[in-house]
A protein has these predicted regions:
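Short glycine-/Asp-/Thr-/Trp-enriched loop segments that recur within the blades
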Residues: 2-7, 55-58
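Acidic, glycine-rich loop-and-beta core segments that form the ion-binding/anion-interacting portion
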Residues: 15, 25-42, 56-59
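Beta-rich accessory regions
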Residues: 39-60, 65-176
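Hydrophobic core segments of beta-strands in well-ordered, beta-rich domains
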Residues: 1-2, 9-13, 17-27, 71-83
Length: 176
């Protein structure tokens, strides 16, 4: 969170045997939702992991909570603020609820079981390549993923594409 102008929508809670600190971090050139897992001794939080749940360009203002099943759930705004003049009828929506976990020292996120029936394996906006994929967006820079893909799931809702790579190891939320 270094070199940030400010942080919005902070959340701090116990998640499993760790504590979770989240915030939307605003830097000069980006707005990202960031996560820290670590320990809390009652007065000091010591982060053990820092990262982002979603690598896409359009995820912000995440809200994290524990549900009645004990899952750590994240719902974020997919804002589209850069496109307000481009598509005036909307400037985003909320993401699907995702269960987030710290697994093998890495943050993962995957749609909660209640919405998994919406998942598909392909979408016209997603172009598979030999070593990843790209997501075409109307007149704007494409989103590109390079890496091994063992599993790829997609949820599309209108102009929103949420892509889950390798069981949620990488996530891309994109306003098309």
């Amino acid at each position: 969170w270094e070199n940030s102008r400010f942080a919005e929508c902070p959340s701090f809670m116990k998640s499993g045997d760790k504590h979770l600190l989240t915030a939307s971090v605003c830097k000069a050139d980006s707005h990202r939702f960031s996560v820290m897992y670590g320990t809390f001794d009652g007065s000091k939080f010591t982060p053990e992991y820092t990262g982002e749940v979603d690598k896409g360009p359009d995820q912000y203002a995440g809200q994290v909570f524990l549900d009645i099943k004990g899952r750590t759930i994240l719902i974020s705004w997919i804002p589209g603020w850069n496109y307000a003049g481009y598509r005036k009828k909307d400037i985003g929506c909320m993401s699907v609820p995702r269960e987030i976990k710290l697994t093998d020292g890495k943050i993962t996120g995957y749609p909660v079981e209640e919405v998994r029936h919406l998942m598909k394996e392909d979408d016209p906006a997603l172009i598979r390549t030999a070593n990843g994929f790209s997501i075409k967006r109307d007149g704007r820079k494409s989103v590109v993923y390079k890496g091994k893909i063992n599993d790829l799931k997609i949820i599309r809702d209108g102009y929103i594409l949420e892509v889950f790579v390798n069981g949620g190891e990488e996530i891309y939320s994109v306003l098309l």
